[in-house]
């Protein structure tokens, strides 16, 4: 299916930030993509283009890189505010709303869907509203934000969850725990990628990162195809 691709600026509380839009012709759904700590959706563009080719308009905000592996309440809430601006502007009641995120981006999607997240210092983060996602595709999410009682009991949506067995940033044991918690509320498709690390899900690796996934091209093609099938099912 045809789609157009543009990058433009929008405003949030008089502050401008950038979004990339991959707009599908006669879109079947709207996908909000949320990048990880680095904040750039450009590193995932091949994946997002495949999703757009399958008939979904993709909205991908650009964020400033988080300076620390343990982000603060203020840093995370700033991203959530940008995401809520995007959701208000680009989600429509007549179109299915889907979230797709990697690492801390996947974590923020869970918060937007109703999860009660706490920072490592115990401060609550979260949106002003609970957004009704039809489905969430979560790649190597940061789980520790939701390990307190009742954190995810209000999340009620279909989940596609993938994690790498060789992930040392968000270990597979945490992903399995997240699966066990989430499947109490609804259906969870979980896939543990045997050779994948934390950054294997990025089409363009960050500087100085070597991937444990030996055949990246085949892996990324299969990843994109499976995610596209999930969001359009």
Residue ranges: model-predicted function:
Residues 124-187:
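The feature captures the conserved acid-bearing segment of alpha/beta-hydrolase catalytic domains
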Residues 49, 53, 114-118, 180:
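Short, well-ordered alpha-helices that flank and scaffold nucleotide-derived cofactor binding pockets
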Residues 86-152:
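Primarily recognizes the serine-hydrolase "nucleophile elbow" in alpha/beta-hydrolase
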Residues 5-7, 58-60, 136, 189-192:
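Conserved beta-strand scaffold positions in the cores of enzyme catalytic domains, especially
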Residues 72, 111, 149-151, 173-174, ...:
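Short aromatic-enriched loop/helix-cap "lid" or pocket-rim segments at secondary-structure transitions
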Residues 6-98, 200-213:
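Serine-hydrolase catalytic machinery in alpha/beta-hydrolase-like enzymes
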Residues 187-233:
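C-terminal catalytic histidine-bearing segment of alpha/beta-hydrolase fold enzymes
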